[in-house]
Amino acid sequence: MGIFNVLIVVCLGYVALLFIVAFMAERAAARGQSSWLRSPFIYTLSLSIYCTAWTFYGAVGYAARSGLEYLTIYLGPTLVVVGWWWMLRKLVRIGRSQRITSVADLISSRYGKSNTLAVFATLVAVIGTTPYIALQLQSVTLSFSSFAGVEATVPPFGDRNAMAFWVAGGLAFFTILFGTRNLDANERHHGVVMAIALEAVVKLVALIAVGIFVIWGLAGGIEATLAKIDASPIGTFTPSAGRWAGLTFLSAAAFLTLPRMFQVMVVENEDERHLRTASWAFPTYLMLMSLFVVPIAVVGLELMPAGANPDLFVLTLPLSQGREGLAMLSFIGGFSSATSMVIVAAIALSTMVSNHIVMPIWLWLKEDGGTVVSGDVRGIVLLSRRVSIAGVLALGYLYYRISGGGAALAAIGLISFAGLAQVLPAMVGGMFWRGATRAGAMSGLAVGFFLWLFCLLLPSFGEGVVLSAETFQNGLGGLAWLRPQALFGITGMDPLVHAVMWSMSLNTLLFIFVSLLTFPSPLERLQGAQFVNVFQHSGATQGWSGGVAQSEDLMVMAQRILGGPEAQSFFQAEATRQGLAGFLPEPIPDFLQRLERKLSGSVGSATAHAMVAQTMGRATVSVDDLLRVADETAQ
């Protein structure tokens, strides 16, 4: 059996192992035997989804090219979990009390359950994650090619582009099977979390094993390794203070705004107290992941031939010394890093697309007289999530093809970080400032996103691909102040720092300025009070009044989304809560609040609010709720 066939078998076997682990975890949770799944250490290991193929392969290449600058990628998350864990706790509490399913759902819920804002946040998340998906495809494709050599060019793979296509297809198939079995996105995915925890251990063990081999097997011990580091060009790199600060900020922002991080950190959180454990255990994990980066980079530069790709030193160093077993472990570690990121990111993005794009379109068709069979709604949501997963992987593959797949892994990752960070002002502002408005959030996010697109994403394809060489040199439309990498005539800056500075500063300034000029709607004010004072009002949501709904109508609507058994169980429990016989409660405001929160786990807060409002016929915020907001504002 050729080495390429061995790699295929190993990958399939590893995926099968993940399926078994996930299946056993789901069965244990279904039987109520999931106390070990709720361990704070399992939660901490799930946060390792931050460490993708970029940190497994690309950190070494980053160190070889830029010295200690690679540490900024670990420093940002460390500062967040150590210094800002109280903010993470608030974020988790908001997610639980509002039944938030994604970053877009959080933004939508905070700003008056605006689906327009949710749609835009979803587009930002999808487009911002696309380079990151391409990064995973590139890393897996490069590792296949390096390991298998000439065998990787045989049909049906042909070349790296064809190989990337098959990798994308396989990851899409795996993710669809893995992550779309449950409709309620707010339910805990015990199987997925357990599989991520296993992958966290695998990639850490693989990287440490390679590091030990490099230090004691190739460099001659710790003292000899330190001497090599001192003599290496890596020690001569002098990082720019501006770039160092910018990258640290970017990695911290990405830790909060990456869709996959929000999924595991907020949606999958079982207990807020787990954040205390994560505040020291996760930085320890990051330290171990970064411990051997410089030694591997230094020894790789010394032993590997000139022109060798430093992004692959973790794999090619063992191969060059005939250590196929260690190289296979390294390959599995890199494959594990890529698959875990793709699975969780695709799950999170597909939830956003189905909740904030597909379901609103369905509601619009229904309102305009379209015919939709009641029993098809669950199928529509699940199908849309599966198609979205395939679409996300297709976008990643398209970016890989257009960009040529030749950029350094770290460069691709930083482009993605900068795009997803545009959500940060609206997110943090909404958590701590009642005066933040939907208009402010939309204005800031739109300006920041388009500046990132113009200054960083489109130029990443190269001159003449998307933006013409004339645009690079003379500016858009011949306007010199609209050059992508010298905006407003500012020249001489690092392109990444330039794009981040303009996009984030104008995003934040416009968010604040427009919020000060506009007035929030009553629902925005109510949601703002719930978010800012979440620890005082964790259980409350917006009120309902003025409705004319019948319980039967609400039951029919709930069955379309939740399914018959779950909807009947929920309605019966609510009827019992009201002291009524049977399974139809009175449509009082408290019941409608809980029904909306229940539905939001499946279709998102904005769509759930719209569906209940549509069924009610007319819905407004109650006077009592407005008085409560006024009282809180006065305090």
What are these regions (language model features)?
Residues 555-628:
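Intracellular, membrane-proximal regulatory regions of polytopic membrane proteins
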Residues 632-635:
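Short, charged amphipathic alpha-helical "coupling" segments at sensory-output junctions
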Residues 1-587:
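Membrane-embedded helix-loop-helix hairpins and adjacent transmembrane boundary segments
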